[in-house]
Design a protein with these regions (language model features):
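Short, conserved loop/helix-junction motifs that constitute active-site signature segments
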Residues: 103-109, 267-268, 291-293, 314-319
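Electropositive, gly/pro-rich neighborhoods at or near active sites that engage anionic ligands
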Residues: 2, 16-20, 36, 47, ...
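Glycine-rich P-loop/Walker A and Walker A-like loops and their local beta1-loop-alpha1 context
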Residues: 2-35
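Short, charged N-terminal beta->alpha structural module
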Residues: 256-276
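Conserved nucleotide-sensing/catalytic segment adjacent to the nucleotide-binding pocket
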Residues: 48-99, 103, 296-299
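Accessory, usually C-terminal, subdomains that scaffold auxiliary metal cofactors
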Residues: 304-373
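Short acidic low-complexity segments
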Residues: 242-246, 282-294
Length: 393
């Protein structure tokens, strides 16, 4: 049995800042955001004469160096998801005192973050060598350091331990229904094995099913994504109509599409389409490495979430406008920090009817009879006229 998929190693990060800049506020905001999402975070920084826990806001007893060492010790003991030590002096002291692993090794590469004024960068290099990452003092740069590979656990952490009310398995698609919504996922292989496990899976909570998104088994992975969507794509979710891809219809630069979808030619002008089984005029999957860097925008099929290509795509298209679209897209703001600007997915209205259709082999073009395609946009996305829609239960 394989261990659950782990996010890759992250090099220790240092935020480079001007002397006197309010960098502790930046790292506190980042630490709090990670903690609110459910990640285990140990974080401290100095405010005035007092050391403070950046997650709780409570003062911490001891000298700055003592508190830094204690924070890193607790993070390692608890196998925290993130350790934040405000100020390079405290970080260096803690690492040396505890002989903490700053390179490949212990704790599966626990992300460690600190700060340093730009005039002391050489001290960072002398201490860390070539194994560290320098980070610009922006929220977006911090999330890029954190990495899109962690989006799966992020999504699962937000799912409530609710009752699973229905699991519908068809030849190519799967639906999981919870008390507040229903979610879909594409099945990457024959579903026969999954059909025999429905009773077992239905006894689990929605949160337990969502945790299967960390599985290496493709069918379990699909169950996990469907459960995630059952939580976030609520029956009463509000958004703008359509999958949102039309927002890229007037882009001046190249628009890359990962996975063709109905109405593509009417939505986008001269897109560069990448498909696993390309037709004439389309590109194979290997072309992602050449086409995504430097593109103006990318429209990405939600199936990439299930086959685990999405984190790679987000890295390759870093800095470009990105829309994640398709029936299996989780409609949650959690994905915006990982680089998505637009999220277009399905909000189910008739879960019973859709479940029956999926068992009978329905294809995505038929799903609209049982719900509505809506999209969410990141706050800083360019304005575009659209029609708001509230899904009905």
């Amino acid at each position: 049995m394989f261990q659950p998929a782990q996010a890759p190693w992250i090099n220790p990060g240092v935020v480079i800042h001007d002397a006197g800049a309010p960098v502790d506020e930046l790292i506190a905001k980042f630490a709090n955001s990670a903690a609110r999402r459910g990640f285990l975070v140990a974080a401290c920084a100095q405010r005035g004469e007092t050391m403070v826990d950046l997650v709780s806001g409570e003062p911490l007893a001891g000298t700055p160096l003592e508190v830094a060492a204690r924070t890193l010790r607790v993070a390692m003991r608890d196998d925290a998801d993130l350790a934040v030590i405000g100020g390079f002096d405290g970080f260096r002291h803690a690492a040396v005192e505890l002989t903490a692993s700053i390179g490949q090794g212990a704790t599966q590469g626990m992300p460690v973050l600190t700060t340093i004024p730009d005039g002391r960068v050489l001290e960072w290099h002398d201490f860390i060598g070539h194994g560290g990452t320098m980070i610009a003092p922006t929220t977006r740069a911090l999330w890029r350091w954190w990495g899109p590979e962690r989006l799966y656990r992020d999504l699962a952490l937000g799912v409530a331990a609710d009752e699973v009310r229905q699991i519908a398995v068809g030849p190519r698609w799967l639906m999981v229904q919870g008390p507040a919504g229903a979610g879909l996922a594409y099945l990457p292989r024959n579903s026969r094995e999954l059909v025999g496990r429905i009773a077992e899976l239905k006894r689990k909570s929605l949160r337990q099913l969502a945790e299967l998104s960390g599985s290496w088994d493709p069918l379990e992975m699909a169950v996990g994504i469907a459960a995630i969507n059952a939580h976030y794509n609520r029956f009463d979710l509000e958004g703008e109509m359509g999958n949102g891809a039309s927002a890229f219809g007037h882009e001046a630069g190249r628009v890359v599409v990962i996975g063709a979808f109905p109405g593509l030619s009417e939505t986008l002008s001269n897109p560069q389409v990448i498909e696993a089984d390309p037709r004439p005029g389309e590109y194979p999957t290997v072309a992602m490495d050449s086409l995504l860097p430097g593109c103006a925008a990318a429209v990405v099929a939600s199936s990439t979430l299930i086959n685990r290509n999405l984190p790679r795509i987000l890295r390759l298209a870093q800095g470009s406008r990105i829309a994640l679209v398709g029936p299996a897209t989780p409609l949650t703001h959690r994905l915006f920090h990982y680089g998505c600007e637009i999220l277009g997915g399905l909000v189910v209205r008739d879960a019973r009817g859709l479940g029956e259709a999926i068992r009978a082999g329905a294809l995505p073009r038929e799903f609209g009879r049982f719900g509505h395609y809506l999209h969410l946009k990141r706050e800083d996305a360019p304005a575009e006229s659209g029609c708001r829609f509230r899904a009905r239960p």
